[in-house]
Amino acid sequence: KEVLDGYEIGSVIKVLSAHRTPEALKEFIETTIKDGTKVFVGIAGLAAHLSGNIAAHTTLPVIGIPGDGGPLNGLDALFSTVQMPRGVPVATVAIGKAGAVNAGHLAAQMLATGDQDLAKKIADQREEQKRILLEDQ
């Protein structure tokens, strides 16, 4: 959310489960599409079927973040998120916090394909990262 806010991209956060609240998840997906959602981001640990379930209910881009909890520290979530059947893709990022940050940047990049102002904000952010890195040396 912080990354999206930095790009002035609106977002909706909802806690739902592919296993425990499947009907509510489907309804949320349908409602947010009607409201103009362009990209979905899901984070789940362990069996981690949330992002795949979202992808099953929309043709919009879905970004999956494997949660870093559980006895395998997110490795099980990574495999569950990345191993999708042909034709139902989920763009999977790194496990945990780093993945969450990159999911925000990736969502912004997807949206920027049709938004020159957003594309400039992303380019400016990259330049700022470069400046900070070079300054710290």
What is each PLM-predicted segment?
Residues Y7-G10, D35-K38, T58-P61, P85-V90:
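Short coil/turn connectors at secondary-structure junctions
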Residues P22-E23, L46-N53, L72-L75, A100-A103:
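Short glycine/serine/threonine-rich phosphate/pyrophosphate-binding segments
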Residues L16-A18, G45-L46, G67-G70, I95-A98:
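Short, ordered loop/turn segments at secondary-structure junctions
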